[in-house]
Amino acid sequence: GTHPCQETCVTSTRCSTQGCHCNWPICFKN
């Protein structure tokens, strides 16, 4: 699917974009 939060992440980091969560290896909209 799509992930409108254009950010990569690791399990120990939080996504800087508000309303997004980390689902390794990218951030997804909540």
Curated annotation (Swiss-Prot):
Gene Ontology biological process terms, A to Z: cytolysis in another organism; defense response
Entry protein name: Cyclotide hyen-C
Lineage of source species: Eukaryota, Viridiplantae, Streptophyta, Embryophyta, Tracheophyta
Family listed: Belongs to the cyclotide family.
Domain notes for this protein: The presence of a 'disulfide through disulfide knot' structurally defines this protein as a knottin.
Matching SUPFAM superfamilies: Cyclotides
Numbered residues of crosslink Cyclopeptide (Gly-Asn): G1-N30
Role: Probably participates in a plant defense mechanism. Does not display any cytotoxic activity towards K562, HeLa, MCF-7, HUVEC or red blood cells. Does not bind to phospholipd membranes containing 1-palmitoyl 2-oleoyl phosphatidylcholine (POPC) or 1-palmitoyl-2-oleophosphatidylethanolamine (POPE).
Organ and tissue specificity: Detected in stems (at protein level).
UniProt source species: Pigea enneasperma (Spade flower)
